Amino acid sequence: MDAAFTAEQDEIRRTLREILGRRCGPDEVKAAVRTAGGYDRELWQQLSRQLGLPGIAVAEDYGGVGCGPADLALACEETGRVLLPSPLLATAALCVPLITALGTGAQRSALLPSLASGGMTAALAVPGPALATALALTGGDAAGQWSGGGRAGGVQARADEAGGGWRLYGEAAQVLDGHSAELLLVAAHAGGFARSRTLLFLVREGAPGLVRSRQAVLDETRPQARVQLRDVPAELLGEQGAGGEGADVLAALAATGRTASAVLAAEAVGAAGEALARTVEYVRRREQFGRAIGSFQAVKHRLADVYVQVQAARSAAYYAAWDPDQGGLALAQALEALRTAAGEAIQLHGGIGFTWEHDAHLYFKRAASDELLFGPVHRLRAHAADRAGLFAPAAAAAAAPARPVSPAAAVAAPPPAHEKVAV
């Protein structure tokens, strides 16, 4: 494995850092989240035209740059540093891979060029707070119960016998950038109890019966929406077989979850590194008892511990960008590093770190919000351990039937003469 970045990757990171340094300062971030869309549309168009940011992982045949998830992860590390509010994650990391994997040739040709150019944004709508489950980040759900599972709730899909196509009814909450996206990918349950399955549908902006509202959230730089579908016409993503079965949506969602977790890990590492850098800069300038507080040994040790944790998380994130199968574990480590770095930033900034005007709380809110959306950390680690089979021998031994024990063997043998017996 060659861990060195290519010249093109270094250039993308350098250019992106320069643009964000000029256009995405703390004041610009706070102004962007207060707009109707929740992000700076002019900056989004600049990043799309100059760097092709939304199309980094889109094939060149569809107007993209033709790079892979690793390049998208490196770009998101830079956007995470400044907590850039943008539809990049929802569009490029969640929706583009699903359209590429499941869409028909006509659907890919119609949608991917617009998404790659930044002219269209997309959002993945999953019923309830089940995004981590749908993406198989915290455990699989072979039955797709999170989408409705034949019970009340979720989003239900029925075939429109009269006009063809499909109709959707239900509600999805915590949809990333769902209030501003021109295209929604809606996960819905179809087939009732007998032929239960989860399918993905395309819903256009302005479709009759579609009601979207922006939610009040903990992290304003990660806008979310509630999407209500009231008999909304929809188009099935992909083709439906003769038996009524669609593509393997759950497998495609799980594959998307693996690459998205690597991207999220890089983004969280970027935020953690910036929170640490700002804290180090502050303790060098802040004086107490006639000297900089950064010269105190206790402060040095705390920041050194954070530095080690952030660097370890960065290494894990880079490895996951190369091997997305390790994305869940890298995401757990990155979220933990961000939470620690943001918490120490607030503590070491002292009283000013608790104020609304300072930026420290934004990084802490990003840490808490991402863990609520994509975690929690202990479940990410548990699922990674299950996938690696770490506890398979123990589970097999526990499931094995007990062997009968003879009465003679049940009596404990006396200890050897040389062995001491504890009383």
Map each language-model feature to its residues:
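Alpha-helical interface subdomain recognition
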Residues: 1-80, 118, 255-423
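Internal helix-loop-helix
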Residues: 48-121, 177-181
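Short beta-strand-to-turn element immediately C-terminal to the catalytic PLP-Schiff-base lysine
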Residues: 101-103, 127, 186-189, 201-205, ...
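A short, Trp-centered hydrophobic/proline-enriched beta-strand micro-motif
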Residues: 118-134
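A generic structural signal for well-ordered coil/turn residues at beta-strand boundaries
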Residues: 120, 151-153, 179-182, 196-197, ...
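A short core secondary-structure module
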Residues: 125, 165, 171-210
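Flexible, small-/acidic-enriched active-site or ligand-binding loops
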Residues: 137-145, 174-177, 204-238, 243-244
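Cytochrome P450 C-terminal beta-domain/meander region
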Residues: 149-169
